[in-house]
């Protein structure tokens, strides 16, 4: 169905199956820190070396991870349905590594670095980083991770596009997100108010469950397989 708009919102639950921890709780080396103590502009400018050591550790974990079946099913959906879009709260880049092309990153990307002085932004895939904290090759300024920290606004372009897609969605799929981090958590409600069918995939109930037309109470990979089969059966595909 050429004009069927399918929008999917993903959270940490889909990456958990790739072995990426949520970076809360008992993560050994860093468990004495809470993410909200390190992932802030204040923490970064107070101690950029400490914050970068944490991100360097996270980047190394993510580099070893592989996209899982859930990521791959979303890639298949994009290939089959022309108006399929993916909005993610994740910063790990696993959707792109799985082959997804139409990805809107609400919280940035851990593989991006941005200079706090001149604003130059680029991808940096080296792990571990040769220098901590890394410096800008253009001006020598301090580089920061290209992610959204606590207390920062989401990128305006990504957020406005996410709202636009949510308003236009016929089917809105929510996968592995807690439904408590705003403004992302509002998107399924925006879709619902505009007539979309909301499908949730999450082993737990969330604030989104009450508005979901279908809830697959299971992990991302198995739940998404069922959603994929349902969409193909109901709407067919271009092929």
Curated annotation (Swiss-Prot):
**Active-site annotation:** 107
- The top EC class, named as a word, is transferase
On cofactor binding, the record's note says: Binds 1 zinc ion per subunit.
Localization in the cell? Cytoplasm
Deacetylase sirtuin-type domain location: 1-234
**Enzymatic reactions:** N(6)-acetyl-L-lysyl-[protein] + NAD(+) + H2O = 2''-O-acetyl-ADP-D-ribose + nicotinamide + L-lysyl-[protein]
Q: What is its main location?
A: cytoplasm
Where on this chain does NAD(+) bind? Answer: 11-30, 89-92, 176-178, 202-204, 220
Report the sequence similarity comment from the record: Belongs to the sirtuin family. Class III subfamily.
- Known role: NAD-dependent protein deacetylase which modulates the activities of several proteins which are inactive in their acetylated form.
Protein name (Swiss-Prot/TrEMBL)? NAD-dependent protein deacylase
Organism whose genome encodes this protein: Aquifex aeolicus (strain VF5)
Protein's gene: cobB
């Amino acid at each position: 169905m050429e004009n069927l708009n399918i929008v999917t919102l993903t959270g940490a639950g889909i990456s958990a199956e790739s072995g990426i921890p949520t970076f809360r709780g008992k993560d050994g080396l860093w468990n004495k820190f809470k993410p909200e103590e390190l992932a802030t502009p204040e923490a970064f400018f107070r101690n950029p070396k400490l914050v970068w050591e944490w991100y360097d550790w996270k980047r190394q974990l993510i580099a070893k991870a592989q996209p899982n079946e859930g990521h791959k099913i979303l890639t298949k959906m994009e290939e089959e349905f022309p108006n399929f879009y993916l909005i993610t709260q994740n910063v790990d880049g696993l959707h792109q590594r799985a082959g997804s092309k139409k990805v809107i990153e609400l919280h940035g990307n851990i593989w991006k670095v941005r200079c706090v002085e001149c604003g130059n932004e680029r991808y940096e895939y080296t792990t571990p980083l040769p220098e901590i904290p890394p410096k800008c090759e253009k001006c020598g300024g301090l580089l920061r991770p290209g992610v959204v920290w606590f207390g920062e606004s989401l990128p305006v372009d990504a957020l406005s596009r996410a709202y636009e897609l949510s308003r236009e969605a016929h089917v809105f799929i929510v996968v592995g997100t807690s439904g408590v981090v705003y403004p992302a958590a509002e998107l399924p409600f925006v879709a619902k108010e505009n007539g979309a069918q909301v499908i949730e995939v999450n082993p737990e109930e969330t604030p989104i469950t009450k508005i979901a037309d279908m809830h697959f109470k299971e992990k991302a990979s198995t739940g998404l397989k069922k959603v994929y089969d349902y969409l193909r059966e109901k709407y067919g595909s271009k092929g």
